[in-house]
């Protein structure tokens, strides 16, 4: 059916071609198509048979073509550097192979040129190698000699000559490095080595000295002591080490800086005395006593506040440390008892409170300093008396006998703490007639009448499970 349709179409074409172009004597025996020339007929017949007699003669190429014009077109790909594919599109496989071949050829030419250049320059290269070795040896020797110059410089750079500080440290920044005159290389090296050695010794000694300093040395004008030390050592002309760390400032030092210095001579004498304090510190000297004595010895005015209570010795024989500990929040009744036991005189707690009020009134009266300037009044902080559940509401002050009775009772209760039963514990917590006003618990227990009776808290005896008639569940 299909063959009949194809024959009809070819017959119509042959008739139309014959009518247009003239006769077509060469007719295809398979499809009955006519051609004007014989080569056209043979080329057409090869499409039916699949014969390809025209083969490519390029080495490595196995392509064959049915027409000769196709073979000539294919040969242009091998001959030209930039081959053109069919219909203007490049074939990737052919272009890649061609590029590889071109690169191999170029690389071979380069290798040949390099080998020729090496052969021509072989005689001159041997003459150049020997002076190069000599130059390398000379540079190595120079580097070894130069290392002796750089090592002391590195040691100097590693140690800082000065520290950055605030305005307080700027006042005492007299540390300076003298200029090194470059006369001879050997002289400069010796000077640098001596300076580095001196600096290391000074730095180690300063570290040891600062570690041994007590707290009082840090609170006593560090800037003046450092300036005096630098003035004494400035004539030596050597490198001076900076102290390892700045002296720490406390609350007393801020009050100390508020007082002006009278004269330059007094400041110099004050710095010399501070230097003596730094070199010979007192081991067991309290902070407040050191500062107060320092101001008293130098004649410097100072504001009157709670910090200088050590100047006013109490008539009862209490020291300044005992009074200061009275106002600190962390001290308890036990510390006051220890201080009381160390002194020979026995004073009750009410006398201490009276002395405190007298001191506060004296301080309120002094509103001017030695220079006639008004001072800020410090408010006297009175202790708050809290009612105790274990103390009867008595209007009079606690006597000495009641104080010691309460102390002994508390010590006995602490000794009997492990063997105390529930009844003793109840009696201990509800001692409402033998205690003082000072020892007040933070949370007072409720009165004895509000608690349930002991009969309600007794455990109820229940029968054992085995004695009960229990049946298993059904």
UniProtKB/Swiss-Prot annotation:
- The segment annotated Disordered runs over 1-24, 45-131, 306-325, 360-401, 440-474
Q: Where located?
A: Nucleus
Compositional bias (Low complexity): 310-325, 462-474
Q: Where are the zinc fingers (C2H2-type)?
A: 26-48, 54-78
Q: Which Pfam families match?
A: zf-C2H2 (PF00096)
Name the InterPro entries for this protein: creA/MIG_C2H2-ZnF (IPR051007), Znf_C2H2_sf (IPR036236), Znf_C2H2_type (IPR013087)
The source's superkingdom equals Eukaryota
UniProt keywords (A-Z) are:
Carbohydrate metabolism, DNA-binding, Metal-binding, Nucleus, Repeat, Repressor, Transcription, Transcription regulation, Zinc, Zinc-finger
User: What does the entry list under GO cellular component?
Assistant: cytoplasm; nucleus
Q: Where is the composition biased (Basic and acidic residues)?
A: 1-23, 45-55, 66-83, 93-106
SUPFAM superfamilies in the cross-refs: beta-beta-alpha zinc fingers (SSF57667)
Q: Which GO terms describe its biological process?
A: carbon catabolite repression of transcription from RNA polymerase II promoter by glucose
Protein family according to the UniProt entry: Belongs to the creA/MIG C2H2-type zinc-finger protein family.
What this chain does, per the entry, is described as:
Involved in glucose repression of glucose metabolism genes.
Q: Know the name of this protein? A: Regulatory protein MIG1
Q: Which organism is it from?
A: Kluyveromyces lactis (strain ATCC 8585 / CBS 2359 / DSM 70799 / NBRC 1267 / NRRL Y-1140 / WM37) (Yeast)
Q: Which gene is transcribed and translated to give this protein?
A: MIG1
